[in-house]
Amino acid sequence: MGNHNINAEEIALYDRQIRLWGFNAQQALKQSRVLLITASPLANEIAKNLVLSGIGKLCVLDSMTVYEKDVEEQFFIEASDIGQLRANVFKKKLHELNPLVEIDTDTSLISEIDEGKISKFSMVIATQLDYEEFCRINELTRICNASFYATSCFGLYGFAFCDLINHNFAIDRVVDNTKVEEDMFIVQKPMKEAFQSILGETLKPRLAKKIPTLYPAMLSLLKSKKSDPDSIRQVCIEQKLNEKTVLNGEFLSKFSSNISFQWTPVMSVVGGVVSQDALNSISKKQFPIDNFWIFDAESGLAPIYRL
């Protein structure tokens, strides 16, 4: 462990946010060690915000090289970077944003992530993986007692899942015209258990009606990488959800065409929400995502569901 005391240079750089959330919160950020899995366009947004906030260390894990498509989708990447490792390009650009944050890279494959790698970090943020990969990494973060975020964007849609295990935090309340800090505590489920908990046979009718069509649609994408109506219906069958209640024909007809691209505004919103929530959880400020957040840019809705 390095020196986690905030020095004069850092106080000057982070002065505005120290005034906003306090010295202790900034100290907690400096002590944090975050593993960001994949150098995706979404990870681009998240990494930028984390590094500018002054976390202690960020490690970008990605084994891919830069292609022309990356140049089109990521503001970190330029045409001259084609052929280089994405993780190395990320490291260079992130260091330019904030030289005070330690930036590291890992070019391992996703399948090579093990307990030894995860144990070095206090938080893991995984982006653009499939369902099984998300769940496997979440199992490792629980073994290592590390906070976990899973997040992806699909065209006009995005989601974030949060597993902070057992999380203590504080929120500000106004009591008798006086601001007081109230201690809070939540217990969260691992991703696999949380997603299996939405079974139609165990839901009350009132709750079943609140399940958005976007839920089985996204789960179909995560599990099978398929977005056609039949695949989405299959998810409803597996989760014992009432198709007539959950599925919306008009939505299904548009969903497939709305996920075939990466749209920067959506990634900015999702990346901003995930990074801010991660910063809040590190500093133990504000109520975190508990535990599944969906963003629908088409409707402008962004509900949170407690699975």
From Swiss-Prot:
Gene Ontology annotations for the cellular component aspect, listed alphabetically: cytoplasm; cytosol; nucleus; SUMO activating enzyme complex
GO biological process: DNA damage response; mitotic chromosome condensation; protein sumoylation
Keywords: DNA damage
Gene Ontology molecular function terms on file: ATP hydrolysis activity; SUMO activating enzyme activity
Keyword Hydrolase assigned: no
TM regions (residue ranges): none
Keyword Transcription: no
InterPro entries per the UniProt record, alphabetical: ThiF/MoeB/HesA (IPR045886), ThiF_NAD_FAD-bd (IPR000594), Ubiquitin-activating_enz (IPR035985)
Pfam families listed in its UniProt record: ThiF
Function, in words: Could be involved in a ubiquitin-related process important for DNA damage tolerance. Acts in a process which is defective in the checkpoint rad mutants and which involves hus5.
Name assigned to this protein: DNA damage tolerance protein rad31
Organism phylogeny: Eukaryota, Fungi, Dikarya, Ascomycota, Taphrinomycotina
Gene that encodes the chain: rad31
